[in-house]
Amino acid sequence: VIRKTMLRAEGAVSYAFQGGEPTLRGIDFFEKVVEFEKQYNKHGIRVNNALQTNGYLINEEWAAFLGENHFLINEAWCEFFQKNHFLIGLSVDGTKEIHDSYRHTKDGKPTFDRIRHAAELMSHYGVEYNILTVVNQKVASNITEIYEFYKKQGWNYQQYIACLDPLEEAHGENEYALKPEQYGKFLIELFNLWYADWKLGKQPYIRQFENYIGILLGYLPEACDQRGTCGVQNVVEADGSVYPCDFYMLDDYKLGNFNENRLDEIDTKRTEIGFVERSLLLDEECKTCEYFHICHGGCQRNRDLNELTGKYQNYFCESYKMFFAACLPRMKETVKTLEKR
C-alpha cells in the first residue's frame, strides 16, 4: 500500500490507521510503517499519519513514538507517537458513567480511567490528539455536562460524530439510536456553549463548527460530510481489499485488492460503481433549501432514497434546519469579527 501510493502521490499523502483497534498490531508494525514511508518517499512528499484508538493499550513507549511520527497512547506507545509525529483520534464518549456504559472490556470491566490516563500520557509526551465522541442518545442528552467535563480535562480539540444505525436497517430502532429532533437540539446546545466561550476567547476547537465558519469565509471544509460530496480515498482491509469509504466496506462496494490490482484499476472500479457520482444525487427540495449553501446535503451514509424521484435526502435534514435556524446568525457574526482582524 505504501509503495504504490508513494509512487503516485504528489505533494502530500495521508495514512490513517483505524480498526478494530490498530494498536493491537503492536509498535513493531508501526515502526515498519514509518520505515517504509521513508524508503519509498523518493520525491520529498509530505507524509501525514493518523491513528484512531480506544486508548486502552497506550503507554509511554507508544506516546513517544506517536509524537515523533505524528501519530497518537501507554508510555511506550506515547514515546513512539511523539517521536514519529502521529496525530491520534482518542475515542471518549462523554463522562465516565456514559463512556463506561458503552465502552467496556469483553468481561464488562470499565475502560474510562485507563483512557483518561492514556490522554494524560499523550499530553505529557507532546503527542497531538483529538477527542472523538460518538453522539448517541445519552451523549446528546447530557452535552452540557460533557462539554464542561472536557474543558476541565483540557481536551480542547473535539469531534462529535452522529451515531449511525447499521447499514440497511431502519432508523431509530436501537436503544442508542439518535433521532433527528434530538440531534438538532444537541447541535444547538453545543453551539450555545461553544459560542459563549468564543465570546470570551476560550472556545475549544470543534471541527464541525470550525468547518461551517470556514465555509462562510469561502474555504473548502476538511470534512467530506460537510462538502456534501464523497472524496476519493482508499480504505484498505488487512487482506488488501479496497473500498471507497469506511462506511461502505461491503462486497457490493469492493474496488479491488492492493495485492492484485494497480491504483488505476481501483480508480476505474470506483467510477464503474458510481460511488462519488451518487453523492451528487440530491433531492430538489434539498438543493433549493435556504441552508444548502452551508449544509450541502451532508454525508451520503445518512441519506435515504426517495423512490419517487430517485434522489436522496439526509435523515438528519430536520436536525440541520433546526440548528441553522437557531445558530447561523451567530456564525455570521463570528465571520464578520474574523474578517475584521
What are these regions (language model features)?
Residues 2-18, 25-163:
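Radical SAM/AdoMet-radical enzyme domain recognition
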Residues 28, 61, 76, 114-117, ...:
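Generic recognition of stable, solvent-exposed alpha-helical segments in well-folded globular domains
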Residues 100-113, 120, 124-229, 235, ...:
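Radical SAM enzyme [4Fe-4S]-AdoMet core and its adjacent flexible, acidic
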Residues 249-341:
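Flexible mid-to-C-terminal extensions adjoining Fe-S/redox cofactors in radical SAM and related proteins
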